[in-house]
Amino acid sequence: MSAVSQAGERFFATAPRGLEALLAAELGALGAKDAAIVPGGVAFGGDWRACYAANLWSRLASRVLWRVAEFGYAGDEDLYEAARGVDWPRYFDVGRTLRVNVSATKSPLKSLDFATLRVKDAVCDRFRDATGRRPDVDRRRPDIRVHVFLEAARGALYLDTSGEPLFKRGWRSGAGEAPLRENLAAGLVMLSEWKFDEPLLDPMCGAGTILVEAAAMARGRAPGMKRSFGFEKLKAFDSPAWEKMKRESRNPSPPRALRLFGSDR
């Protein structure tokens, strides 16, 4: 059985605050199951097709994370043991570069930097025990991102299926000063309840991000079509299924006359 056909995975899609309800509806339309809204994102279940579709089609998500473990903890060593207990070589090759990110709410840990170091050590130690090698760390452009979310006494470990944040659509060649992120721009368009046959004016358009996102929505263009994703570097990656999904997404709606206007003066 291919990895993509197995159901029952758990994911978490992060998003700008205020867009969680819209994101839950969007993910549901893309095949997500049991969506649960929390501040800053949406937890959901599904198979790998749902994960691929969320990365390819979500206009609102910032990242789609795959949950690989949950645990209780009281200190740094509990965190190390929880991360060491995950069979990381099952998920990615030792030759992949690695980055660990830790975020926390009401955590008793004194230093998140030290917690990050301990999780990194745990992942590398697990690989050393299994393969005799340790993955290299790359903080700028890693192949694999491990995310750790900590609450007061519980935590979860995730693998990032997105790679670069999803608001990086792949079309922007440069960024002006304080650019509006694409997923936030898409959320503003959705919240406006703009209809495609109506004019849309952005009187402070800057780089035109709101108008570009509006045009992409009207055309039915997949926002992730021109970029790569973190899941392509995981062992669970099903290339034929992914290529099929991309082929099926390359048929946007026929061109329509849009009235989009932008000004920055």
Positions of predicted regions on the chain:
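Short, low-complexity, intrinsically disordered N-terminal peptides in bacterial proteins
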Residues: M1-G8, R247, N251
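Non-catalytic nucleic-acid substrate-recognition regions in nucleic-acid-modifying enzymes
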Residues: A3-I144
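Short flexible coil/turn linkers enriched for glycine and charged/polar residues
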Residues: A7, E151-A153, G208
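Generic beta-structure capping elements
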Residues: D47, S103, E151, Y158-E164
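Short glycine/proline-rich turn/loop motifs
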Residues: S103-T105, F167-R169, P252-S253
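SAM-dependent Rossmann-like transferase core, predominantly class I methyltransferases
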Residues: L157-L191
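Conserved S-adenosyl-L-methionine
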Residues: L180-R265
